[in-house]
């Protein structure tokens, strides 16, 4: 693991992907379940102060998320634009806490993930790709129902920033490798939107290979590792009951 990059990040720091995921996790823990108003409040807090990130300011945020967060309120948290530019991969990068909190109920995980995605990304493609991603991540495998969604061109060295390309590219990195580490290295070394494709790949590969497959040398460098693990455990406990 190395630092640097366009934001000169230290080893183990996270970008907007991680910050928004932590903001969602905090809302679930505080409210003991899905609370879009609390998630909106946390997003706005992060946008203003950098809280939930690794610094006391926001050093990385996409235009779609930034515009939506500025527009959303706790009374109306669903502020995602609906134009063709609002089909970015930022809607997938932050969903791990929702799947942890609903690990016994895929339909609930899908519904809540779609809702949180629509808070910042309102394009019509978001719903089907979010449902596909959550379903296949929680099952730990590709399914024939979503085969067509993975046929987006992934041969280019750079990703496009769209949800379509990120979803296909992440699965490609998992399918063409045989370990968590190799999948992540393949994904992030494509460059361009490496943090987001890496985050999406990490969820898929994490489900496939398990926590024990994450290299210890990576975990040792992770900023606030103990706090993140504690949050993950609290989220997992929220999903103790099966679907009703």
Where on the chain are the PLM-derived regions?
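Structured, active/binding-site neighborhoods that engage oxygen-rich ligands
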Residues: 1-244
